Amino acid sequence: MSSVAVPFYQRRHKHFDQSYRNIQTRYVLEEYAARKAASRQAAHYESTGLGKTTCRLCARRARSLAHEAMQESRKRTHEQKSHASDEKRIKFASELSSLEREIHMARHHAREQLDRLAIQRMVEENMALERHVVEEKISRAPEILVRLRSHTVWEKMSVRLCFTVQGFPSPVVQWYKNEELITPASDPAKYSVENKYGVHVLHINRADFDDSATYSAVATNIHGQASTNCAVVVRRFRESEEPHPAGIMPFHLPLSYDVCFTHFDVQFLEKFGVTFATEGETLTLKCSVLVTPELKRLRPRAEWYRDDVLIKDSKWTKLYFGEGQAALSFTHLNKDDEGLYTLRMVTKGGVNECSAFLFVRDADALIAGAPGAPMDVKCHDANRDYVIVTWKPPNTTSQNPVIGYFVDKCEVGLENWVQCNDAPVKICKYPVTGLYEGRSYIFRVRAVNSAGISRPSRVSEPVAALDPVDLERTQTVHVDEGRKIVISKDDLEGDIQIPGPPTNVHASEISKTYVVLSWDPPVPRGREPLTYFIEKSMVGSGSWQRVNAQVAVKSPRYAVFDLAEGKPYVFRVLSANKHGISDPSEITEPIQPQDIVVVPSAPGRVVATRNTKTSVVVQWDKPKHEENLYGYYIDYSVVGSNQWEPANHKPINYNRFVVHGLETGEQYIFRVKAVNAVGFSENSQESEAIKVQAALTCPSYPHGITLLNCDGHSMTLGWKAPKYSGGSPILGYYIDKREANHKNWHEVNSSVISRTIYTVEDLTEDAFYEFKIAAANVVGIGHPSDPSEHFKCKAWTMPEPGPAYDLTVCEVRNTSLVLLWKAPVYEGKSPITGYLVDYKEVDTEDWITANEKPTSHRYFKVTDLHQGHTYVFKVRAVNDAGVGKSSEISEPVFVEASPGTKEIFSGVDEEGNIYLGFECKEATDASHFLWGKSYEEIEDSDKFKIETKGDHSKLYFKHPDKSDLGTYCISVSDTDGVSSSFVLDEEELERLMTLSNEIKNPTIPLKSELAYEVLDKGEVRFWIQAESLSPNSTYRFVINDKEVENGDRHKISCDHSNGIIEMVMDKFTIDNEGTYTVQIQDGKAKNQSSLVLIGDAFKAILAESELQRKEFLRKQGPHFSEFLYWEVTEECEVLLACKIANTKKETVFKWYRNGSGIDVDEAPDLQKGECHLTVPKLSRKDEGVYKATLSDDRGHDVSTLELSGKVYNDIILALSRVSGKTASPLKILCTEEGIRLQCFLKYYNEEMKVTWSHRESKISSGEKMKIGGGEDVAWLQITEPTEKDKGNYTFEIFSDKESFKRTLDLSGQAFDDALTEFQRLKAAAFAEKNRGKVIGGLPDVVTIMDGKTLNLTCTVFGNPDPEVVWFKNDKALELNEHYLVSLEQGKYASLTIKGVTSEDSGKYSIYVKNKYGGETVDVTVSVYRHGEKIPEVNQGQLAKPRLIPPSSST
């Protein structure tokens, strides 16, 4: 037997070979094989019989043998089946018992394993708790016990940096080189890291010159972090091995790929332009560059400069050059990044460069009104525990002035910033003390003004707190054979214990708030580390005060604060080491705290000159006192706005600056202020106002030179004017010609040509000529155009017309444009009948004809163009002979509307003149506004007048009429194609004519037409309000065509300030029906308004007037200011209330209902002005007419409220709303009749609109389901509940605006419990109804005189008839002649006592009971003797029964 235990899940699996896969199949196969064998045997016999002659006996015998063999085979097969079945049964029984044993063993093992796991888990939890307690006790943040030490080593030496740190959990240590993480895996030959028992070591193998850096170690765990750093300086062994300047090699080396000695041709395909950005954004300046030839391993050097300072890859800037692009990316913009950026492509052939200015605006302040962030934070004069931080102040153009700065420091590798100064420092320089030697720090600065604190500046470059003198305290000694020995000066000083005093104590920085003292360490100084103590004394005091008594200074620098302003001080310094303190140094000269650097004076005269369409050049004179200037800030303002904006956000050092981002055509003024460390100068005087326009230059060259006609001796040329006139009007053109294949050009005209068409005379027939044209303005003559095609001087005789010329594109919009041209000079043999316009996209070859039929106009609007595509156009003239020559192809036109495109607008001026107006901000002094009608220049001065002022132009219509309808256009020269058109149709002209007529013939505008209002006394006021009325305006009222005058009946007045004219009629009667008109005149302006008061309108105002008069009279005595109204309180009470006024003590107030007075518990307090009547628990009986009356000697008033009908229903709805909010959840109450669902409310009335629902079906009240309620409850009675009554029940009460639902799920256990309780109560009620009981007849006490006969009779009841037994003193009464008992008709029971004696006194009881129970009634019998006083008995009290429960068998 194998010793290996079989798993439980494998023991349950049964394994069979092929023979046991299916026993039944195996038996079938065996039987089939036997039959097959018998069949073969029989066939064999038959075949044998065919071959031989066999007798019948032999054949019968053979068949008998075969039959026997078959029977034997069947018998054997049956026995095998029976045997197999027995084996199978035995096998299954054995396996079942084995399976039961295995299951039992598995359960046992599982129970043991579960117990083992429970015990193990308990032990682990206890151990974890104890471990957590222990860890909490020993947990602490990292603490550095031994810090890193700086090293100065020679090249090729190894450096071992080590420090000790403790903390729990064990800190994770990371090493940094100049803030970059050191990963030993990246350079395993250079770095290796060790950690043994908290001592961490960084090995730097074979240090070279590049390993000089600041190394930091940062230890971190979950409780905090700590860091230490040091400096490693690697020096070369020989001075001759210092690296040579670039390009000077002492021996031949492979040249670097960055050194370009191959000639390249560099072209800038796309340059970066002036850019505006905001602090905190990311930005990339890009230039597309074409370098020829393009070599993979050799290319030009791309250098980026900011204000002529080379930019290198850093945390803030990323450089890229490749794939035809040079890019400079800014990861996080700050104002430090503002400046003039230049990209220089350095090649052998020279330098190609492009420049543009980057402006960086302040980010949004965290606090409104706070200043911008300072910039350019730098560190100077770093030492062991001291550094001076400087910065540049922000420009505060629109903010309050800066009152000081806060300086923050942070140790490199950490993120916790610490504020260095408690009070804001006034100047842009601050000495930071208290640094830890060997650590590296970064700094930032925040500005403060009266509004708050600015955002922090960009952090400074890291600076290490090291003494630079330590590196100089080594000395080189030259020995024979060229060897050198490096020794430290400490080794030469001998054994010095107490150091000498410092020397050369002086003030290196003096300001109003502090003095920085500097000194030289003592010589000799000794080998022990030195510290210093500083003492000060006010001149004349005679006493010395130690400044740093608590903390010694390690650096030979110290900033002394807390000095009295204006008082001179002297200072001395003492050096100290572990052996003692030196003598004091020599006393300094008296030093007085004061600002050495003063605020600069204001810059001088500021001059602004034109530069481009969006920029202006600003120049100024430098201030008289410009010492220690940081630079200048320039501000600009739109003339008249008085709002100044900063032009630059970082001080510039030169006195000429180009201000960008200005709006074309706007006028600006400029001012400049100087800035240094102390602050800002006063603003300079403002410059003269200047309009932003491009500077005056020579015009650009003409283009599109076309031959328009030729007669064999002369040629007529046409051309297009230059795109840009240079800022001043073009005075004319100069033409040069030359014959083909000639070198020299010849002047055609000596004087300027004012038009763009000219006929060149004295030409040779059949010769070829080319021409070039130059334009001239006041600045000079511009560049000539490119030479034209070669034109042959041969007379034109073709019948078709010549080419159109001067194609001009205007009104370019997103999907359309307008094409203009001039008629051909050569018309052909017949007049021109029209023109065909063709166009195509630049990249296609097929031309498209825009108009199927020739147009007779010399303009055409081309539509259905694609936005963003570029097209070219040409025009062909047509006459009777056919289509003539095509014009020159126009310049490519990009179809897209320019941003800010403006259109012609129509209007009417203050004098009523109709005009068309246009505004063009891009217009310059040289621009002309050219108005046209149907694209023909307007020259008719009789019908039109043109006025142009600055960038606005208007076309006035002198005598507008229908002949002025049409299309008007305008184009502005010397711009980038600014043009527009306007269709003046009949509807628009009519609108303008109407508006013009209103202005020329003015009407007084009215705020409101003539209206009326009825005043409190029944007076009627008629009034009208105009927009405004002058004091000289006149008015009059007309009633039924008769003017009325101001008097007692008609009081007429006018409020000129508000424009109100009114007339008040004291008594308005039936005679006043008619038409009312008011007429107003104010200068030339007139207006009137009428009001018709007849028929129903008059009756309405008359009725209202009478009503107001009655109301006025009513209010003269006590009256109701608010008549009776009702409201529902939170307690579901109805409150009838009214408000009263003008009462006095004698005023009487009463309540009535249906004419009868109502008695109230407390008389109302009329002084409060309110009276209330409470109706609790409202019902139908409270319906009626309620009335309140007020009366005194001045009169009386009545208010009535009919509380019935709709009013009653509204109150019920209001009660439903208040009561519905207090509805409780549905509750179940079981009774003998069934199950009752109840909802309790503050108030319930059966007239409230409520519904009960079962399974979302509304329930109607009936025998099965009864709906009812009481004063504070609504219920649903389910009689004889069954299973069908299960489900959700909903009670909903409706108010006027909302409803309130309560739901109960009567199913499951809730229904079962309720049904059981109902059945119990039903049975109890049935038993109570049918049990045996005494209905009445027996008194509580009976008194009788002895000798009398006592008869106690009562009526009993029970179903079935009860058993009746009498007792005396709780014992069964023995019946005899003295005691007689009878029961008649099963319900009348009596006890007769004959001859009563005193012994018969006692308690008698009657016991009545059937199967449902019964009761016992006690009667006390008192017998007295003759002559005794009769005992007092309370008469009329019946005996109280005692219940008897039913027998347990019932």
Curated annotation (Swiss-Prot):
Coiled coil: none
Matching SUPFAM superfamilies: Fibronectin type III, Immunoglobulin
InterPro entries: FN3_dom (IPR003961), FN3_sf (IPR036116), Ig-like_dom (IPR007110), Ig-like_dom_sf (IPR036179), Ig-like_fold (IPR013783), Ig_I-set (IPR013098), Ig_sub (IPR003599), Ig_sub2 (IPR003598)
SMART domains with a match to the protein in the record: FN3, IG, IGc2
UniProt-listed Pfam families: fn3, I-set
GO CC, one annotated term: M band
Region called Disordered, residue ranges: 66-87
Domain Fibronectin type-III span(s) in chain numbering: 373-468, 501-596, 602-695, 698-800, 803-900
Keyword Repeat carried by entry: yes
Keyword entries, A-Z: Immunoglobulin domain, Muscle protein, Repeat
Ranges annotated as spanning the membrane: none
Domain Ig-like C2-type: 142-233, 254-359, 899-995, 1002-1115, 1118-1204, 1225-1322, 1333-1422
Organs and tissues of expression: Expressed in pectoralis and cardiac muscle.
Any GO BP: sarcomere organization
PANTHER family in UniProt: MYOSIN-BINDING PROTEIN H (PTHR13817:SF49), TITIN (PTHR13817)
Function: Is a structural constituent of myofibrillar M-band in striated muscle.
Record protein name field: M-protein, striated muscle
Biological source species: Gallus gallus
Taxonomic lineage from the root: Eukaryota, Metazoa, Chordata, Craniata, Vertebrata
